[in-house]
Amino acid sequence: MKRVLTALAAALPFAAHAADAISGAVERQPTNWQAIIMFLIFVVFTLGITYWASKRVRSRSDYYTAGGNITGFQNGLAIAGDYMSAASFLGISALVFTSGYDGLIYSLGFLVGWPIILFLIAERLRNLGRYTFADVASYRLKQGPIRILSACGSLVVVALYLIAQMVGAGKLIELLFGLNYHIAVVLVGVLMMMYVLFGGMLATTWVQIIKAVLLLFGASFMAFMVMKHVGFSFNNLFTEAMAVHPKGTAIMSPGGLVQDPISALSLGLGLMFGTAGLPHILMRFFTVSDAREARKSVFYATGFMGYFYILTFIIGFGAIMLVGTNPAYKDAAGALIGGNNMAAVHLANAVGGNLFLGFISAVAFATILAVVAGLTLAGASAVSHDLYANVFRKGATEREELKVSKITVLVLGVIAIILGVLFENQNIAFMVGLAFAIAASCNFPIILLSMYWSKLTTRGAMLGGWLGLLTAVVLMILGPTIWVQILGHEKAIFPYEYPALFSISVAFLGIWFFSATDNSAEGNREREQFRAQFIRSQTGFGVEQGRAH
């Protein structure tokens, strides 16, 4: 039975809408025993790490942040492992395979947000926060309302992203391994819960590090073999690709993915600012000892990811030459077996045989586990730390907070499995787009302005943040993806696919207006406290003990 491959949408924001090249019908593949054996080795090894980590998780700090003992280099690898996905690996390679140069431009969208994190967020975030970004947002503002807003923003992003990951995981594993979709979803959910439940951030970090190393190694080997084929000449690579590609020289020209400039700008803003508002990414900056290590983390992560996306560009052009011209990888109709998303997987077979194909397939599964583990921990910390310990039950003991966190992990895992099964045949591409839009429109403005704008008040942050979140949701529903493609209406009320340009503007304007017009005594007190916060954010004085939030 043919199915639509939605795996790409699981971790490649907006990509399912960007081009026909990255969607299409695929058939379930035969059982890939090499991949299954290699994946089982990975699972056994990472479960061993989880057992090791569980013996070292003795406190709330150990569980949420690995005790702050992760080095900048290790955290950079872990961030890269959390952010680089199997779907971006397969999806961007597929974009290059079908559209050429546009694939490289698209991959840059994933990197442009990181300089913002490096120069504007990482250092101050680490100096002001302890476990979640809500610690920073509520540093001088009212704890209750701000934590509720931050937790809601985090949970909505985590839920949307997690559902998309689970559905994408099931489709991808069915495609690569030949396993039943439901078995794949349950397997991912159970392993995800085990990593986070027993090993916390320490186990999650090492799963992400191992996954990043494996993915970088696999992609490097593929790129090396492609370049070896063309005599390590980029000129030969592009010339040969243009000679055999149906579009010819057009694959070296940009502009084929997003024609409308408004949509292009909105897409770019969503990718850029959404990255800086993802709770599972921001949480990683609390795992290092100080602001210096936080900056190092972003520096290393950006380097690893930049290198990775360059490799996907080479892999995509290699697939044009070695896969697109080989009838063994095509069906009777002349289409790529498994769809265009299988271009990189077929290339793995072309350059390394069945054994390397099994390795790449296992790495693809490992990447999914690394991402969902990070998402689950971020969601659990939002519930246990932000809501339970600081809003609903102030003064809760560490033991009580950790108990709530672990219960939340189980609940999130079960819900993710159930929704993953229920959404099997649904279009979930919009979920990731909406997750990034909310991260960019709610989380990012509050984090940025709470650290940099002295006139921010609780009233402005609350009203502007909720306006940004709701605007992103409403415009996404009224846009072409949901209103037309899913709900079946003839014409979209909101004409653009990507709401970020408008929802981010609403959020910033709302925060500015309602803060500027806030003349309350509480608002004035919050403005006066900015100086103390600024000194702490710059110097890190007192960060070792942490502020009682």
Curated annotation (Swiss-Prot):
Transmembrane segments: 33-53, 77-97, 103-123, 148-168, 183-203, 206-226, 262-282, 303-323, 355-375, 404-424, 428-448, 464-484, 493-513
Keyword hit for ATP-binding: no
Topology in the lipid bilayer: Multi-pass membrane protein
UniProt keywords, alphabetically: Cell inner membrane, Cell membrane, Ion transport, Membrane, Sodium, Sodium transport, Symport, Transmembrane, Transmembrane helix, Transport
Compartments, as annotated in UniProt: Cell inner membrane
GO molecular function: acetate transmembrane transporter activity; glycolate transmembrane transporter activity; symporter activity
InterPro entries tied to this protein: Cation/Ac_symporter_ActP, Na/Glc_symporter_sf, Na/solute_symporter, Na/solute_symporter_CS, Sodium:Solute_Symporter
GO CC annotation: plasma membrane
GO biological process, one term: plasma membrane acetate transport
Alphabetized PROSITE patterns for the sequence: NA_SOLUT_SYMP_1 (PS00456), NA_SOLUT_SYMP_2 (PS00457), NA_SOLUT_SYMP_3 (PS50283)
Pfam families: SSF (PF00474)
Chain's role: Transports acetate.
Family membership: Belongs to the sodium:solute symporter (SSF) (TC 2.A.21) family.
Protein name per UniProt: Cation/acetate symporter ActP
